[in-house]
Amino acid sequence: MKKYNYDRLKDAYRQFSAAETEYMKACNQDDEQNQWEKEEILNACTDILTVTVKDVLEDEEDFIQ
């Protein structure tokens, strides 16, 4: 795997993991607005991670062929 792709995956996963942690913390509070905001951030990070994985797989596939 190219280092560039590894770094992209690592960064996207780091962002997702941090957002997931913040969302879980928010779920333990009574502040519904905060929960909603953290869920929106988590959803965005999930989308970013999904797109990054797709892009990296396509790039690595091109690299292998």
Regions found by a protein language model. Name each.
Residues 1-28:
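N-terminal acidic leader/helix
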Residues 18-65:
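Short, charge-rich amphipathic interface segments used for partner binding and complex assembly
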